[in-house]
Amino acid sequence: MKFVDEAFIDVAAGDGGNGCVSFRHEKYKEFGGPNGGDGGRGGHVFAVADPNLNTLVDFRYARRHEAKRGGHGMGSDMFGAAGADITLKMPVGTIITDAATGQPLYELLLPGEVITIARGGDGGFGNMRFKSAINRAPRHKTPGWPGEKKSLKLELKVLADVGLLGRPNAGKSTFIAAVSNARPKIADYPFTTLHPHLGVVRVAPEQSFVVADIPGLIEGASEGAGLGLQFLRHLQRTRLLLHIVDLAALDTGVDAQDAGVDPVAQAKAIINELKKYDRQLYDKPRWLVLNKLDMVPAGERQARVQDFVKRLKHQGPVFEISALTHEGCGPLVHAIFGHVQSGQRMDNEPPPLDPRFASAGPA
C-alpha cells in the first residue's frame, strides 16, 4: 500500500419525483378542485470521515454510487416520499476533487465530518400549486429536477500513526512486514525500499494503527543526499517515530559494508538530519528500536544495548527486537497501540471552555 491512495468514482444523486395532476371527486361537489401533490426530493450523496478506515481500497471495486429518486406526487394532496440518501465512508484525510477539471472540492480532515457531495433534485409541482382565481382547474404539473451527477477523484494523503526511521538495511522493511499486512521488497543491499510503504497493524478486530516505512536515511539527507528527503514530509503528521538501529552492526565483522563506521555516530547523524529538516519532526516522541537481536550472542546482548544507549544518550523508551524471528515485536506493537490510543483520546477531548462564556450559576 503506497502513501497516496487514489480512486475514481461516479456519484449520482436521486432525481426529484414528478408532480401529479389530480382532482377531487366527492359527492355533491361538482368542481372539487385540484389535489395533485408534489414529487419528493431525490436522495443526497454524503461523505463521512470514518476514523476506522485507512485506505480507499473499497472504492476501487465499487465505482458507481447512486441515491434513490424521489417518489411521485399523488392525488388527495399526497406528496411523494423523499429518495433514500446514501453515505460513503472515507478515511480521514481524503481529498475529493473534480475528475474532469482537477479542482479540489472538499477535504475530510475531522473524524465524523459529514459533507454533501451530490444534492438530490427537487420534486416537481403538482397541479394544486397552479390553482388561482382565474384558473380553478389547472391541468399543469412539472417534472422533478435531476439530481447532481459527478465524476470524482478521491486522493488519500494518509495520516500514518507511526513512522519508521533508520539507515538503509536497518531492518525497517522486515519489521513492517512482520507486524502488518505490508509486503515491501526486502533484500541485502542499501535502498531496497525506493518508495514509502504503509502497513496496517491490527491489534484486535477493530483496533489498528498505520505504520509508514520510508527509504533509509543517510547523513546529508536534509540537503538531498540519498532517497529519504523527498519522503520525510510524509512523517510530519505521525504521532510517533521509531528509530530502528541494526544492533548487529556494532560488531564490524557482521556487516563488512559498514566496517570501521561507528553505528552510534550513524544514529546521531540521522537524528541531526531530522533536526535540520524540521524542528517539529525532531521534537516528536521518538523510541529507539534495536533490531537484529537474533544475530547477537545472547551473552553479549545486555552489555551491547547498555553501551549503545549510553553513547547515544537516548532518553526515551528502548525496545530490543528481531524483526526476522518476531522476538520482542509483540510487546512493542502493544506499546505503540497504547501510545496511539492515548493521542487519539487527547484529540477527541473537547476544547476547554472559555471562562468568559461560562455560566455564572445560581446566585
Curated annotation (Swiss-Prot):
It comes from Verminephrobacter eiseniae (strain EF01-2). The lineage of its organism: Bacteria, Pseudomonadati, Pseudomonadota, Betaproteobacteria, Burkholderiales. Mg(2+) binds at residues 173, 193. One of its GO terms (cellular component) is cytoplasm. One of its GO terms (molecular function) is GTP binding. GO terms for biological process: ribosome biogenesis. The keyword Chaperone does not apply. InterPro entries: G_OBG, GTP-bd, GTP-bd_Obg/CgtA, GTP1-OBG_CS, GTP1_OBG_dom, GTP1_OBG_dom_sf, OBG_GTPase, P-loop_NTPase. GTP binds at residues 166-173, 191-195, 213-216, 291-294, 322-324. Monomer. This is GTPase Obg. Residues 1-159 form the Obg domain. Belongs to the TRAFAC class OBG-HflX-like GTPase superfamily. OBG GTPase family.
